[in-house]
A protein has these predicted regions:
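Thioester-forming pentapeptide GCGEQ
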Residues: 16-30
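Serine-hydrolase catalytic core recognition
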Residues: 162, 196-209
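A conserved hydrophobic secondary-structure block that centers on an alpha-helix together
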Residues: 30-49
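A flexible loop/linker signature enriched in serine peptidases of the S9 family
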Residues: 1-19, 34-40, 55-71, 83-92, ...
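Residue-level detector of Asp-centered blade-edge/turn motifs that repeat once per structural unit
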Residues: 47-48, 98-99, 160-161, 203-205
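Short loop/turn segments that connect beta-strands within beta-propeller blades
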Residues: 24-28, 75-79, 136-140, 181-185
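Hydrophobic beta-strand positions that form the internal "hydrophobic ladder"
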Residues: 52, 103, 164-165, 207-209
Length: 209
């Protein structure tokens, strides 16, 4: 007799779970950080190495969305975990601000209670429309950064050198490159010769891309 929890439970390896561990490059010691029946993965590490953003997932087949994600901040010194976002099926990632006091959250318009929705009442926004949100860790206040920005955000990086957020977005038939000031939310498209900017990399201590 076998208990099948959900359709995917028939697939080999479905019950395998991922966990996080800290590896000390100096001593070679490996310290497990998480354990349990939920998959856990790292979203980002603060610049000072003190905090870790980690996400977990769990299934909920009775209603949309069927997969829920939670976001935690783990103190690497005390191993205390702080819940930042609980069971949100529409977030997809998170990154620390350069000073570690804020979190840049990516997801669809329905993320975080639908604060990023920009459609008529009764309409459901596209789950593939990428949006950015700013979460203040101290008071958990969330600000939608791209609610009135039409292109769909793909990949975003918060630059340490100038404090600006750089991201690519699906702009009609192009993948364009943009820069955002997180202080006022102003977005500027960067003029580059390529129509399809698939990836980019930033220097941490210099204004170089």
């Amino acid at each position: 007799i076998y208990e099948v929890l959900e359709p995917d439970d028939r697939q080999p390896g479905w019950r395998n779970r991922s966990y996080l561990a800290k590896y000390d490059l100096k001593t070679g010691l490996l310290q497990p950080l998480t354990f349990g029946y939920h998959n856990v993965w790292a979203a980002d590490i603060s610049n000072d190495g003190r905090y870790l953003l980690m996400m977990t997932s769990q299934s909920r087949l009775t209603k949309r969305p069927t997969t829920l994600f939670s976001l935690y901040r783990l103190d690497m010194q005390t191993l205390q975990a702080e819940l930042l976002i609980d069971k949100d099926g529409f977030i997809s990632g998170a990154r620390f601000s350069p000073d570690g006091t804020q979190v840049l959250v990516s997801g669809s318009p329905e993320s975080l209670g639908g604060i990023g929705k920009n459609v008529k009442e009764g309409q459901t926004p596209s789950m593939t429309d990428g949006q950015l949100y700013l979460l203040n860790i101290a008071d958990k206040r969330v600000t939608p950064l791209t609610k009135d920005f039409n292109p769909s955000v793909q990949r975003a990086v918060w630059n340490k050198a100038d404090g600006q957020i750089y991201f690519t977005a699906e702009n009609r038939d192009c993948y364009s490159l943009y820069r955002m000031n997180p202080a006022d939310g102003k977005i500027q498209q960067l003029e580059v010769s390529e129509d399809l900017v698939n990836s980019f990399s930033l220097a941490q201590n210099a204004p170089v891309m």
